[in-house]
């Protein structure tokens, strides 16, 4: 929204206005906000020349601090969700998240949850109320970009598209003294401390052990008016009331962790003090009618409950591998050290902290009125005042140095000018009415501009800004204060992340939300009527509780080319959401993938610099010396293609990673017994060493061989012991906007996937939220029963094996579940429900019996699955549940698919499809379905026992499938089945033309489950290369298709008993093997039509082509016996066609590159973004505005969006044509239209570039791709010649 206090549009101040600090979680940043016309009511963002290339980037991202109009006034807010994301970003936040706005309350929150987020809108959480609202991006103004160390970013104003890693951030905060109307600015985030020494979710070091806090007990030290001191637990403290309530808690303690702070004034009845522990002074008389007024002196943690993760190398410690007790009592808390060296990067809007007055500040006398304004409108006007006060300095800085970045030191102001600043601020805000344009007077602006800025690097202390307040306004707000204080619903209450396992999105803590007794309300009114100003002298060293009201972030970034740029304003950066696996940064540890490279596994590389456009890296190769105390350089620095190197499997270190010491230090010095051994990575050096900040804040530089990164273990063990803690999370906390999630047995389970739900004992799981409406078919209900029974059957046999070692309680539950499921097995849905058949429509508020029935079945399934996971003694051969293709013992030899020229031995259509061995059926398209006598021994599912419970029904289904395959196979698909195992199939799919997969063959093993078609078939992709050549085809064999239940799908995309094997094959051919496979990755489709998406898609195609050639080389050398004849026939012509086509592209690129270098300095075509003007104008006819229609991948958030048998037709659709949306706001100037998307990837190429249209984005070819593809083509040529497939002249 337009800031009424903003200066004239000519002043570029808004771009520099401070904003909230970044989140603890590395969050993507936002692109710049366009600047609408001054008269409009929309956000005034940076001017057009400061924006990104028009139509090339997003506007806002999660965790950005924005300002906009809410309930009639300007408010600050945090972006919590952007279009294309799955769930609220606060679901990822850890313990020390936002306090002031961590819980949404009221209608805004509910509406945000219920309605999907439309394109062009973001979900904003307004400060300080915490209400969430969907707001159009163009109506918001970006105040501060959230970046934290290790974030990958790009520079928004540069034409260079290389990315960089944030190595440090500096955050200047404006903080408000809690309970007052005084603002201190600037305060560096490093000068702010946490109110509580430990919080939920903290990682801690305890001697040699690393652990994570999952619960804690707190107490507060209170001081009475007579000087007596006592300690009270926070449960009793929650019964007291705040004399100066905060607007976001409306007089209610919203959480133990954030509800108390030093200096807080509380009041409550004497009976609450009956169980406190008196520490000093005279204990008062506790009469029933008396009330005590106390001041919080200190907040303390008295007990920690910890999940222990791992033990580090401990030379002076014990050899015991037993972890410490899970409960750490107060006497041992001194041995606990928090891993918090990056706390300063995590300050954000609404967070409460402690601020210690520095010694360099003269003693300050601050006057304020208490209680602070306690209504939304009052707080909203505060946002205007803060922005106005801070903007003055920004304008002065920029007028002095318009061409340079705002230095972090420039924003300081001399304390001598404090009075002048305060006077001006009071004059500006004295009247409740504001001028329409909100601009300051010309005299003020001129005076501010005339002030001399301080020299760069001059450190000055913060100064105090007092919000001006008019007495009339204050009087008028009293009633509103009382109404807000009386409010006891969730509208303005806030629940901190500390009481919730999903950190700050639950409605937990309701037991602490006490209504205010009438006597207390009256007392508050009396207190307000006094209107006396309270004064307090602050001396250096005094600690005060403050709340962050806005921040200004600057970052130090190391770019891919090795250069380091400091003090970049975070608003000038935007995050790289989807980082290519082949992007490497200086300091990354890598290994060589080239066949001819040194086979010594001890040799590893360290990236010195990278060429983003050329896709190459300069790498130094190192090897550990035999002494083990240092490394030696092997050879010279080498320019290597990014496609020829991979991340080191063991040395993966990034800034902020938690590491433990696992070996001796390199200098061989004697070990100290208390030498720290748990810490965080501060920096990865190009010299092949890692700088670590240990838990005691000491720093050392250490070899990677002596460190172990435990990030992967943390992800697995985060909540291993959380069952013991009290979550308090409400059921709606686990809701999400997605559609479904896959289960191990292929059944699509809940309508709402859960958000990282911690393991809970089987019978204590939270009840899933009830859907407002549900439509359930008989097939779906039957499938649920049959799926659960199928899962239970193999587990029944495990009971005997588990014996005494298995947990008895779990097995008792398992037996009960199996009994129930067996009893349900042969009943129809109608019998189970004892009512009428399911109706297509259901009352929104009343869940049907069908829904409850399915929920019960799903719960049983989940319990069984969890129990199965706990039993690790089952032999693989005995498993009859869903096969896990990842653990197959002998991987089949290289196999692959087939094409249209496959021979058909006997063109006979199958009448019965009982199928005799050796008989081949040719479909109308000329493709082949045949029946072989024996299944090969290396078939992925050969070892899975096949015993269908209803054999007659199963074989009838198989015959129908075979008849369909024999008559309807489309061009490019071949299927074989086996007489001895009618449940097994093998399939070959030929890569479609005009895609990176053209002339390639892709092989799949298939099994029909015992209860097919109630559940989908099992597919295993037989990968021929290391790494994925498609987002949906994993090298471990997993195939991600919604029809298989391995990915999210809707409607006809989900498997039903009427679906067929043919549908799945068509979906793979038409929706997986596509021309831009990059967008198949979940969530990436939202990048379609944007510059970043085009770049990533082009680079992905380079990688896919290289892996296709590598895979085909393996197929030629080791063809699987099932399709050996077909593979040889295909590659005798198709192999050389693939070679010649790629070589022609290399020649074309070389010719065009020479031609483009000739004209008058015309730069050669590259993949870097075009300048803003070119991007805006060159393809104006091909751009479409976008603000409301569904995205191409919106129907399915997963990797595919197939529609059953229509898959082939939908495969040929033009994805990019679906990005049309409504026109943007008329008030926005045309030069900064937001987020236009281009129809075709061809529009990103320079005009008249001459690049051929090959069907998918590949040109211009990168230097790294050319290096790698030439190497793999040489190997492919050799393989073809070795296999006796000489090149024919006509092939060329």
Curated annotation (Swiss-Prot):
It is found in: Cytoplasm; Nucleus. One of its GO terms (biological process) is protein K63-linked ubiquitination. It is an enzyme of class 2 (transferase). Residues 1-56, 85-114, 401-459, 472-519, 714-746, 882-903, 1160-1248 are annotated as: Disordered. The modification Phosphoserine is found at residues 50, 87, 89, 399, 401, 441, 515, 836, 839, 896. The active site is at 1040 (glycyl thioester intermediate). It comes from the Eukaryota. Its EC number is 2.3.2.24. Its main location: cytoplasm. The modification Phosphothreonine is found at residues 488, 491, 838. Keywords: ATP-binding, Coiled coil, Cytoplasm, Nucleotide-binding, Nucleus, Phosphoprotein, Transferase, Transport, Ubl conjugation, Ubl conjugation pathway. Residues 812-882 form a coiled coil. Phosphorylated. Phosphorylation affects subcellular location. Ubiquitinated: autoubiquitinates, possibly affecting its subcellular location. Residues 38-56, 491-510 have a biased composition (Low complexity). Residues 406-427, 882-893 have a biased composition (Basic and acidic residues). InterPro entries: UBQ-conjugat_E2_core, UBQ-conjugating_enzyme/RWD. Pfam families: SH3-A_UBE2O (PF23048), SH3-B_UBE2O (PF23043), SH3-C_UBE2O (PF23044), tSH3-B_UBE2O (PF23046), UQ_con (PF00179). A motif (Nuclear localization signal) lies at residues 512-536. Residues 953-1113 form the UBC core domain. Predominantly expressed in skeletal muscle and heart. Residues 478-490, 732-742 have a biased composition (Acidic residues). Pathway: Protein modification; protein ubiquitination. Interacts with CPNE1 (via VWFA domain) and CPNE4 (via VWFA domain). Interacts with UBR2. E2/E3 hybrid ubiquitin-protein ligase that displays both E2 and E3 ligase activities and mediates monoubiquitination of target proteins. Negatively regulates TRAF6-mediated NF-kappa-B activation independently of its E2 activity. Acts as a positive regulator of BMP7 signaling by mediating monoubiquitination of SMAD6, thereby regulating adipogenesis. Mediates monoubiquitination at different sites of the nuclear localization signal (NLS) of BAP1, leading to cytoplasmic retention of BAP1. This is (E3-independent) E2 ubiquitin-conjugating enzyme. It comes from Homo sapiens. The lineage of its organism: Eukaryota, Metazoa, Chordata, Craniata, Vertebrata.
């Amino acid at each position: 929204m337009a800031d009424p206090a903003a200066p004239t549009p000519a002043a570029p101040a808004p771009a520099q206005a401070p904003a909230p600090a970044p989140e603890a979680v590395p969050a993507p940043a936002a692109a710049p906000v366009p600047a609408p016309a001054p008269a409009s009511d929309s956000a005034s963002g940076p001017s057009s020349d400061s924006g990104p290339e028009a139509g090339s980037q997003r506007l806002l991202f999660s965790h950005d601090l924005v300002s906009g109009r809410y309930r009639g006034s300007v408010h600050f807010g945090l972006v919590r969700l952007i279009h294309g994301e799955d769930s609220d970003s606060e679901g990822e936040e850890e313990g020390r998240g936002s306090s002031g706005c961590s819980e949404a309350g009221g209608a805004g929150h509910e509406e945000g949850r219920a309605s999907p987020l439309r394109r062009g809108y973001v979900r904003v959480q307004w400060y300080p109320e915490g209400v969430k609202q969907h707001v159009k991006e163009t109506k918001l103004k970006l105040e501060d970009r959230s970046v934290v160390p290790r974030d990958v970013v790009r520079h928004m104003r540069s034409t260079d598209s290389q990315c960089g890693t944030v190595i440090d951030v500096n955050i200047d905060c404006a903080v408000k003294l809690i309970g007052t109307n005084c603002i201190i600015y600037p305060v560096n985030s490093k000068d702010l401390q946490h109110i509580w020494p430990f919080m939920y979710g903290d990682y801690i070091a305890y001697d040699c052990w690393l652990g994570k806090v999952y619960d804690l007990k707190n107490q507060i030290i209170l001081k009475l008016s007579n000087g007596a001191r006592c300690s009270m637990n926070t449960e009793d403290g929650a019964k007291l009331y705040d004399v100066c309530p905060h607007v976001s808690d409306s007089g209610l303690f919203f959480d133990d962790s954030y509800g108390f702070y030093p200096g807080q004034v509380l009041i409550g009845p004497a009976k609450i003090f009956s169980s406190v522990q008196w520490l000093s002074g005279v204990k008062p008389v506790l009469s029933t009618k008396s009330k005590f007024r106390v001041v919080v002196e200190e907040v303390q943690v008295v007990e920690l409950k910890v999940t222990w993760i791992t033990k580090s190398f401990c030379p002076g410690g014990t050899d015991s591998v037993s972890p410490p007790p899970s409960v750490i009592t107060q006497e041992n808390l001194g041995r606990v050290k928090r891993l918090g060296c990056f706390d300063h990067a995590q300050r954000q809007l609404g967070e409460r902290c402690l601020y210690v007055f520095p010694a360099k500040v003269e003693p300050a006398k601050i006057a304020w009125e208490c209680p602070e304004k306690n209504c939304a409108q009052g707080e909203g006007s505060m946002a205007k005042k803060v922005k106005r006060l801070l903007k003055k300095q920004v304008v002065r800085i920029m007028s002095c140095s318009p061409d340079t970045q705002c230095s972090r030191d420039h924003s300081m102001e001399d304390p001598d000018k404090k009075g002048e600043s305060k006077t001006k601020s009071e004059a500006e805000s004295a009247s409740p009415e504001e001028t329409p344009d909100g601009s300051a007077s010309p005299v003020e602006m001129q005076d501010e501009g005339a002030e001399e800025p301080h020299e760069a690097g001059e450190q000055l202390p913060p100064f105090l800004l007092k919000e001006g307040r008019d007495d009339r306004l204050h009087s008028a707000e009293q009633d509103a204060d009382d109404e807000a204080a009386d409010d006891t619903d969730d509208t303005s209450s806030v629940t901190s992340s500390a009481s919730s396992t999903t950190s700050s999105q639950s409605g937990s803590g309701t037991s602490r939300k006490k209504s205010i007794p009438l006597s207390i309300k009256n007392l508050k009114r009396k207190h307000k009527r006094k209107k006396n100003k309270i004064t307090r002298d602050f001396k250096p060293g005094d600690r005060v509780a403050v709340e962050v009201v806005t921040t200004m972030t600057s970052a130090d970034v190391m770019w891919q080319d090795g250069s380091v740029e400091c003090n970049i304003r975070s608003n000038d950066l935007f995050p790289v959401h989807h980082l290519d696996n082949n992007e490497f940064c200086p300091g990354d540890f890598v290994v060589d993938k080239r066949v001819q490279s040194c086979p010594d596994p001890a040799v590893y590389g360290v990236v010195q610099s990278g060429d983003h456009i050329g896709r190459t890296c300069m790498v130094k190769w190192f090897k550990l010396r035999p002494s083990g105390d240092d490394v030696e350089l092997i050879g010279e620095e080498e320019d290597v293609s990014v496609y020829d190197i991979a991340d080191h499997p063991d040395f993966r270190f990034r800034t902020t990673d938690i590491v433990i010491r696992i070996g001796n230090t390199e200098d061989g010095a004697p070990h100290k017994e208390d030498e720290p051994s748990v810490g965080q990575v501060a920096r990865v050096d190009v010299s092949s060493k890692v700088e670590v900040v240990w838990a005691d804040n000491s720093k050392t530089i250490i070899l990677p061989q002596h460190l172990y990164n435990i990030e992967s273990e943390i992800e697995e063990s985060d909540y291993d012991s959380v069952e013991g803690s009290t979550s308090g999370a409400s059921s709606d906390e686990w809701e999400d906007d997605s559609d479904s999630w896959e289960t191990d047995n292929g059944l699509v389970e809940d309508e709402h996937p859960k958000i990282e739900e911690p393991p809970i004992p089987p019978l204590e799981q939270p009840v899933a939220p009830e859907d407002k409406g549900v439509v359930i078919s008989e097939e779906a209900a039957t499938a649920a029963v049959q799926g659960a029974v199928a899962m239970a059957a193999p587990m029944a046999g495990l009971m005997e094996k588990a014996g005494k070692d298995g947990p008895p309680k779990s097995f008792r539950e398992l037996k009960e579940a199996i009994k129930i499921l067996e009893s349900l097995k042969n009943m129809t849905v109608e019998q189970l429900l004892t009512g009428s058949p399911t109706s297509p429509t259901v009352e929104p508020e009343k869940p049907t019996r069908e829904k409850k029935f399915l929920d019960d079945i799903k719960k049983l399934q989940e319990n069984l699955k969890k129990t199965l996971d706990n039993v690790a003694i089952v032999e693989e051969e005995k498993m009859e549940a869903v096969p896990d293709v990842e653990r197959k013992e002998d991987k089949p030899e290289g196999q692959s698919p087939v094409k249209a020229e496959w021979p058909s031995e006997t063109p006979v259509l199958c009448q019965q499809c009982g199928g005799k061995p050796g008989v081949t059926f040719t479909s109308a398209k000329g493709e082949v379905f045949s029946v072989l006598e024996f299944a090969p021994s290396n078939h992925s599912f050969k070892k899975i026992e096949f015993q269908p419970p209803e054999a007659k029904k199963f074989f009838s289904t198989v015959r129908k499938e075979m008849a369909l395959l024999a008559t309807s196979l489309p061009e490019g698909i071949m299927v074989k089945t086996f007489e001895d195992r009618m449940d097994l199939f093998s399939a070959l799919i030929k890569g479609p033309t005009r895609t990176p997969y053209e002339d390639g063959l892709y092989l799949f093993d298939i099994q029909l489950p015992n209860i097919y078609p109630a559940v989908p078939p099992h597919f295993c992709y037989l990968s021929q290369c290391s790494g994925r050549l498609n987002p949906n085809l994993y090298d471990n064999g997993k195939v991600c298709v919604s029809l298989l239940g391995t990915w999210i799908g809707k409607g006809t995309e989900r498997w039903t008993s009427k679906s067929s094997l043919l549908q799945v094959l068509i979906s793979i051919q038409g929706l997986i093997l596509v021309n831009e496979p990059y967008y198949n990755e979940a969530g990436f489709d939202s990048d379609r039509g944007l510059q970043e998406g085009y770049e990533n898609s082009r680079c992905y195609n380079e990688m896919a082509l290289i892996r296709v050639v590598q895979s085909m080389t393996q197929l030629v050398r080791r063809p699987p016996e099932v399709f050996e004849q077909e593979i040889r026939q295909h590659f005798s012509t198709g192999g050389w066609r693939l070679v010649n086509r790629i070589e022609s592209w290399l020649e074309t690129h070389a010719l065009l590159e020479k031609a483009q270098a000739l004209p008058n300095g015309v730069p050669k075509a590259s993949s870097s973004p075009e300048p803003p003007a070119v991007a805006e104008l060159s393809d104006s006819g091909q751009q479409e505005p976008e603000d409301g229609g569904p995205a191409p991948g919106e129907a399915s958030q997963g990797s595919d969006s197939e529609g059953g048998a229509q898959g082939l037709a939908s495969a040929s659709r033009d994805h990019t044509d679906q990005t049309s949306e409504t026109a943007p706001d008329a008030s926005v100037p045309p030069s900064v239209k937001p987020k236009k998307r281009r129809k075709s990837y061809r529009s990103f190429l320079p005009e008249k570039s001459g690049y051929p249209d090959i069907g998918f984005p590949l040109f211009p070819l990168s230097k790294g791709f050319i290096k790698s593809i030439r190497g793999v083509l040489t190997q492919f040529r050799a393989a073809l010649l070795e296999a006796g497939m000489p090149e024919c002249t006509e092939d060329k």
